[in-house]
Amino acid sequence: MGPRGDVILEADWVIGEFMKTLEQEGILENTLIVFSSDNGPVLNDGYYDDAVEKIGNHDPKGGLRGGKYSIFEAGTRVPFITYWKGKIKP
């Protein structure tokens, strides 16, 4: 699948094992799980690594203004996912 696909598959497996362990230990209902990310993308960081050229038409900031080191949306918003069995509805 390539590096990104491989990481996604590995993360999926590890998270599944983690969830199974919480369930087996009887603590899943008392555990709030939060997955978060770093704030904002940075491509033009002063290093010439072809990052800007390799990205093509992809917009890592999702159309938002700014980026890392910026006070605008793409620099301050942080995506996250939460799970809490029986407490947070999907």
Regions found by a protein language model. Name each.
Residues 1-10:
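The substrate-binding groove and active-site-proximal loops of carbohydrate-active enzymes
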Residues 16-25, 50-90:
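Substrate-binding rim/cap in mid-to-C-terminal beta-strand-loop elements of soluble/periplasmic
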